[in-house]
A protein has these predicted regions:
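Leucine-rich tandem repeat or coiled-coil scaffolds
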Residues: 1-359
Length: 359
């Protein structure tokens, strides 16, 4: 058995401790899903202890002048590999459990030693500033295996946005992380500036950044634009339910034609109206003409205006242009012409199912 899915089973600390020992004793278990249970800091500490046992074994070269008796197929000197005594756990989902700061800190300590885990989901686990800083610090300073980290919806964050600094340092230094989720962190445009300047502009590996449901306003658009221009690996950016408005959207739009890697962009519910939506349509058109088209766009929840508006017509024409180029761009909006006017409708299953017309 490689995958253990025990999500939503009312498992508490005692059950988590027993499962931790089971995982420790069975090196074949690679995935443990405990989402939506009642695991607290004590149970989390047991799981962290098991993760910490899967440390790195560093082979030391023989002293100068001595011979190396390793055979041809043995690992080279100074090789680094997971300890055979530890777990082989690669995927851990503890989302929606009351881990608190103590549980998060225990996991941070484990990440400094662990050599197997690639996916860690800690969404809505009652983490506070101490745990957020500890986890980002561990990934920044001591971990080079983790590829996916979700710290969405913490219990506590700072009004002054100082929790953005550990995240920025982590992104700027880490060379393995591909997905980072920091939705519902209460981040404003000052925090985004920090994350972009000290994190994304230095990062060479991140492919997905999820910052949904934060407080990034119109001033944040310039920082998003800088990230799109300077980062060369970011493929998916989620800014759903922020406050970019028209000015922020225009800044983002101006950078779209300069990015060569962005594939998915989510700007739903950002208070964008006609001016911003028309600018974004022009930006996506530039991506098409530069042979760097997006694969997925989400825009519903912004104000396209009445039927026949410039925004509705501009976006209809952009998708027509994509079709003429043989490019498939999935979106959460579609268009119908009624009485000579372009109407915008929502797609519930993106790109497949129309469900109505708000405008």
């Amino acid at each position: 058995m490689r995958d253990l899915d025990l999500s939503y089973n009312r498992i508490g600390d005692a059950g988590a401790a027993a499962l931790a020992e089971t995982v420790a004793a069975n090196a074949h278990v690679e995935s443990l899903n405990l989402r939506g249970n009642d695991v607290g800091p004590e149970g989390c500490a047991k799981i962290a202890d098991v993760l910490a046992r899967a440390t790195r074994v560093i082979s030391v070269s023989p002293p100068h002048g001595e011979t190396d008796d390793r055979k041809e197929n043995d690992e080279p000197a100074n090789a680094v590999s997971p300890s055979r005594a530890g777990t082989g756990l690669r995927f851990l989902d503890l989302a929606h459990n009351p881990l608190t700061d103590d549980g998060g800190a225990a996991l941070a300590d484990a990440l400094r030693l662990n050599a197997t885990l690639t996916h860690l989901d800690l969404e809505r686990t009652s983490l506070g500033l101490r745990a957020l800083s500890a986890l980002c610090g561990a990934v920044n300073e001591s971990n080079d295996t983790l590829e996916y980290l979700s710290l969405e919806n913490p219990f506590q964050f700072s009004v002054a946005d100082e929790h953005a600094w550990p995240a920025a340092r982590m992104l700027g230094a880490n060379v393995c992380l591909k997905t980072f989720k920091c939705g519902k962190w209460g981040l404003k445009h000052e925090a985004l500036e920090t994350i972009v300047a000290y994190g994304l502009c230095e990062n060479k590996t991140l492919e997905t950044l999820d910052m949904r449901c934060n407080r990034v306003d119109e001033l944040g658009g310039a920082h998003v634009a800088r990230a799109l221009r300077e980062n060369k690996t970011l493929r998916r950016l989620n800014l759903e339910e922020n406050k970019l408005g028209d000015a922020g959207a225009v800044a983002v739009a101006e950078a779209l034609g300069e990015t060569t890697c962005l594939m998915q962009l989510d700007l739903r519910c950002n208070g964008i109206r006609e001016r911003g939506l028309v600018a974004l349509a022009d930006g996506v058109r530039a991506m098409l003409e530069n042979d760097a088209p997006p694969s997925e766009l989400r825009l519903w929840g912004n104000d396209f205006g009445p039927p026949g508006s410039k925004a509705a017509t501009a976006w209809r024409d952009v998708f027509k242009r994509a079709d003429s180029l043989g490019v498939t761009v999935k979106a959460d909006i579609t268009f119908r012409v009624v009485d000579g006017q372009v109407h915008v409708a929502r797609m519930t299953e993106i790109g497949t199912k129309e469900v109505g017309n708000r405008f």
